[in-house]
Amino acid sequence: MNYKTYITKPKPNNHKRKILGLNGLNHDASACLLHGKEIKFAGHNERYSDIKFDEDITQPMISDIKRYGDWDEVTWFERPMKKKGRQLWAGQYSEVFTRKNLPSNYLKQFNIKPDVYIDHHLSHAAASYFTSPYRESVGVMIDAIGEWETATIWYIKTHEDGSTTFEKRWSQEYPHSLGLWYSAMTQR
């Protein structure tokens, strides 16, 4: 099978990217604000709402993020239209034919517009790799479900020029999911 390779390109030294990464509309809504390679803010919304596994991003968390800095770019942790394709295939019509779970619509309440949508498993791979001390590694991502993928294996390497390659070596797609089986057994 042919898998996609993703490459990050470093910006010139005088350009410090300011990125707000958001995850919401499912369990564990969270955010991370990066200025260059420095984490300015990282948090889960359940710390603000006192609701375990809270799926909603709330104004108190957004206000707290703004105290730590601004951003030039907003990334969302999955590709919503790809996810809707899987939901349509699975017969989850109420999820497919609503706009409330589209990030572009959902984030209007905070006056935020997503600039970039990242594949769900690539989001996991990047988060695990960039918070590790390694310059080369294999990443194994297993969860209930991303857009379609339920498990992926990546070869990840940062090169001398500062670029990082994420090469997907294997993936398993819905409905086959170790994570969904785990959720069914643990009722989580």
Task: Give residue ranges: language-model regions.
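Short acidic/glycine-rich loops and adjacent helix/strand connectors
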Residues: 1-188
